[in-house]
Design a protein with these regions (language model features):
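Signature of N-terminal electron-transfer/Fe-S-associated modules in redox systems
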Residues: 1-156
Length: 156
């Protein structure tokens, strides 16, 4: 089956067809940035974009994404190696502690900023409510999203 991951055409052999998108990304396509945590779509650690929409990849059978565009955290880095404004904001605001939830948090934040270029705290909290952070860095997550919104607004 064929799909596009981070802008690159990829092929997944038929013997992977019963696996989740998350498993295929991590174990077959060697893209470990998307994290496994709860396995039931309730924590947000495994969020990727499928055709532009944020989805918990642990819930999606790989056979359901044939022919679709998948964007993972690895796909946010520019070809010149520069970080996406959200990734840089995460660093600038010292968001990560354990870092486990960060890829899913960033992918969910990207979806928010693609819909709302100037979110307030309530907008951020609402958009990010499905993403859990065991370390409780929610204030820094809010700050980083606002910082990225400013930078992304200047780039447009």
């Amino acid at each position: 089956m064929k799909l596009k991951v981070n802008g690159v055409a990829r092929e997944v052999e038929a013997d992977w067809r019963d696996e989740s998108l998350l498993t295929v990304l991590r174990e077959h396509l060697d893209l470990p940035g998307t994290r496994f945590s709860c396995g039931i779509g309730q924590c947000g650690a495994c969020v990727v974009h499928i055709n532009g929409a944020p989805i918990s990849s642990c819930l999606v059978p790989i056979k359901d994404v044939a022919g679709k565009d998948i964007l993972t955290i690895e796909g946010l880095v520019a070809q010149d190696g520069s970080l996406h404004p959200l990734q840089q904001a995460w660093i600038d605001e010292s968001v990560p502690q354990c870092g486990y939830c960060q890829s899913g948090q960033i992918m969910q934040a990207l979806a928010l900023l693609q819909e709302n270029t100037n979110p307030n705290d309530a907008d951020i909290d609402n958009a990010m409510k499905g993403n859990l952070c065991r370390c409780g860095t929610y204030d820094r997550i809010r700050k980083s999203i606002k910082r990225a919104a400013i930078v992304m607004g200047q780039v447009r």
